[in-house]
Amino acid sequence: MLLIDENISFRIVDIIAEIFPGTVHVKNVVGAGAPDRTVAAYARKHGLIVVTKDKDWLENVPGNHSLECNVVYVKLPNCRTDDISTLLINNEYKIKELRGQNLARLALPSR
C-alpha cells in the first residue's frame, strides 16, 4: 500500500501495518540511497503510494516523468516516528483514496 521513503524511520512500517497492509520501506526494497526516480519506478510498478518528508516529491516538473507516482508529503519538521504514524493513521481514508488516481499529491497535515 505505502512505500516509506528513507527520510522516515523504517520502524514506522510495523506501527502502521494493520491499517496499511503491504507497506514497505525503501531501504528494504530498492536499497538505501536509491535515487528518487528508482523509488518512483518501484512505487508505480507495485501500485504503492510514496510517503516522504522530501518536498521535491510535490513538484511535478513538466517533462520530468521520473517522479510520476502518488505521493503523501509529511509536513512535520523534526518529529518522531510516532507523530508520523499517528498522522498517517488519522488520515487513513484520505490516503486510501489516492489508490487508483494518477499523480495524486497529498500534503499532511493539510492545515
Listing of model-derived features with the role each one plays in the protein:
Residues 1-10, 14-20, 31, 37-40, ...:
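Acidic, PIN/NYN-like endoribonuclease modules and their adjacent C-terminal/linker elements
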Residues 44-62:
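Acidic, metal-binding active-site segment of PIN/NYN-like and related structure-specific nucleases
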Residues 25-30:
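Short, flexible loop segments at the rims of nucleotide/cofactor-binding pockets, characterized by
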